[in-house]
């Protein structure tokens, strides 16, 4: 019997064994016994050295074809056994679809994030852009660019977390506005932006103060901007957050980066302006600060204050949440008490 005949006989024997295999162990045993280093096919192939140079490649090609055929047959049989095994397993593990499902506990968006998202949605709909910036900020952008010279009281060490002499944790999100004004090309249109984010102050944590809290500051720069534009924008904020029937009033105030400046009150949403403990019986609740952008701030950003004007405002989502939901202690928002936070879960 020549080598080709031996190989053909081994192939038929191998295919028959593969066909009769019932489990994966048997498949592996056949693979090792047929195709392994000590298997019969390997032994036959060792006899190729006695063949002539003309016969050797023909027999080698024939042997490789048989090896490939057996390898494929082993793989097919393995897949067949695994399918049968899985079918038997599924048959034993029948699921009763009439049983009630297991409830899945889902997370909720934090109430402060909900307020910020609500504000962002409002302003994106008005064509504003939402701009982020660094929390570790330069003194230049946090103070100097906002009309706060070196000797201004707000720059006192007791109010600010200084990292180095010129680097600090931002005390407001206004530096984002200063950076954006520097880069904005006003020949392509006005600047309308809000800058939400975390800010830091050297405050002792108590019911109404925190060393870290949130701000959303807004800025509009264009030609012919007036106080009426500011008032209309603030009215929209108040009605979006606190209810459609809210009114606002503006009281004169002082901020270094705006002139004129105003404190903004909203008519009390608990008593509708009649007077209650929430509004301290005044009918009004202070909610934010605002004003027309100071010419010095425009000029320091490279904007011609004789051509352009604008308004700015700043509000605290933490305070908004406290007022809207009657929370007396700001620390409740940061204690990660799921029982407290789940009260504000969004449905649907």
Swiss-Prot record:
Enzyme class: ligase
Claim: NAD is one of the keywords in the record: no
Cofactor note: Binds 2 magnesium ions per tetramer.
GO CC annotation: cytoplasm
Subcellular location, principal: cytoplasm
Reaction(s) this enzyme catalyzes, per UniProt: tRNA(Phe) + L-phenylalanine + ATP = L-phenylalanyl-tRNA(Phe) + AMP + diphosphate + H(+)
Required cofactor(s): Mg(2+)
EC number annotated for this UniProt entry: 6.1.1.20
Gene Ontology biological-process annotations: phenylalanyl-tRNA aminoacylation
GO molecular function, one term: catalytic activity, acting on a protein
Record's keyword terms, sorted: Aminoacyl-tRNA synthetase, ATP-binding, Cytoplasm, Ligase, Magnesium, Metal-binding, Nucleotide-binding, Protein biosynthesis
Cellular compartment(s): Cytoplasm
Residue positions binding Mg(2+): 259
CDD domains attached to this UniProt entry: PheRS_alpha_core
Nuclease found in the keyword field: no
Alphabetized InterPro entries for the sequence: aa-tRNA-synth_II (IPR006195), aa-tRNA-synth_II/BPL/LPL (IPR045864), Phe-tRNA-synth_IIc_asu (IPR004529), Phe-tRNA_ligase_II_N (IPR004188), Phe_tRNA_ligase_alpha1_bac (IPR022911), Phenylalanyl-tRNA_Synthase (IPR002319), tRNA-bd_arm (IPR010978)
Recorded family membership: Belongs to the class-II aminoacyl-tRNA synthetase family. Phe-tRNA synthetase alpha subunit type 1 subfamily.
Description of how the protein assembles with itself and partners: Tetramer of two alpha and two beta subunits.
Name of the protein described by the UniProt record: Phenylalanine--tRNA ligase alpha subunit
């Amino acid at each position: 019997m020549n080598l080709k005949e031996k190989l053909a006989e081994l192939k038929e024997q191998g295919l028959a064994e593969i066909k009769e295999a019932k489990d994966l162990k048997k498949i592996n045993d056949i693979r090792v016994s047929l195709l392994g280093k000590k298997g019969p096919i390997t032994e036959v192939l060792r006899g190729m050295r006695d063949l002539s140079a003309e016969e050797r490649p023909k027999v080698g090609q024939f042997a490789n074809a048989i090896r490939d055929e057996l390898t494929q047959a082993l793989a097919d049989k393995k897949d067949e056994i695994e399918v049968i095994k899985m079918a038997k397993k599924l048959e034993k593990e029948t699921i009763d679809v009439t049983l009630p499902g297991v409830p899945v506990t889902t997370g909720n968006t934090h109430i402060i994030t909900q307020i910020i998202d609500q504000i962002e949605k409002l302003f994106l709909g008005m064509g504003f852009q939402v701009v982020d910036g660094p929390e570790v900020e330069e003194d230049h952008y946090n103070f100097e660019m906002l009309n706060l010279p070196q000797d201004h009281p707000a720059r006192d060490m007791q109010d600010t977390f200084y990292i180095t002499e010129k680097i600090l944790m931002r005390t407001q999100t206004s530096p984002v506005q200063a950076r954006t004004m520097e880069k904005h090309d006003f020949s392509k249109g006005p600047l309308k932006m809000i800058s939400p984010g975390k800010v830091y102050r050297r405050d002792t944590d108590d019911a109404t103060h925190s060393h870290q809290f949130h701000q959303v500051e807004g800025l509009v720069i264009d030609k012919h901007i007036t106080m009426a534009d500011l008032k209309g924008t603030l009215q929209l904020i108040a009605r979006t957050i606190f209810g459609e029937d809210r009114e606002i009033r503006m009281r004169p105030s002082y901020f270094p980066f705006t002139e004129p400046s105003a404190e903004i009150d909203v008519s009390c949403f608990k008593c509708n302006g009649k007077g209650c403990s929430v509004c301290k019986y005044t009918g009004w609740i202070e909610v934010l600060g605002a004003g027309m952008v100071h010419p010095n701030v425009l000029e320091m950003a490279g904007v011609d204050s004789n051509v352009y004007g604008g308004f700015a405002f700043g509000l605290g989502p933490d305070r908004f949440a406290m007022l809207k939901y009657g929370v007396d202690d700001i620390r409740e928002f940061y204690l990660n008490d799921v029982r407290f936070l789940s009260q504000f879960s969004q449905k649907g």
